[in-house]
Amino acid sequence: MSKSSFQNRIIRAAKLDSNLYEEVEADKGALWQAMAVVIFSSIAAGIGIGLKTGGFSGIITGSIASLISWYVWAYLTYFIGTKFLPEPQTQADLGELLRTIGFSSSPGLLRVFYFIPGVGVLVYLISSLWMLVAMIIAVRQALDYNSTLRAVGVCVIGYVIQIFVLVLIFSIFGGTLPDAPD
């Protein structure tokens, strides 16, 4: 796949193009692209926060954490969506969820603008909500759902489980959860 096709996929994912999510669901070769979108989105957030706070030490750690989180999130949505809340036509594998959810991170590229006084927080908030909507579409398409509400349910259940696991990990190994950007 050419560079322009990859860029086109990122743009289509950000435009919430459901056909794009079907396309990457079916393209087994798109896993590396999906991973790159997750990394780029994480780096963009790290740069935006770093430019505002004056520190860039968390970019690598944040990127690694984003990759782990992406995998865990894809597994949770796969498991919940195929085992607990499937529709009759639901047929998916973990790779399909990894690819679609990875591309749903594309609006997060805008988080690079977090440092801009007066609008940065708004850009960060809007891009985060945009990513959530993209993720719901990605989950709906990957799990072959007719119901967007069911995809929302899978995302909410997965989110609650992931937060519980994070709190458990931090309480066992120490440390605190990171603060949200202000």
Question: Where do the model's predicted regions map?
Answer:
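Residue-level signal for alpha-helical transmembrane segments in multi-pass membrane proteins
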Residues: A44-L51, A134-R140, L168
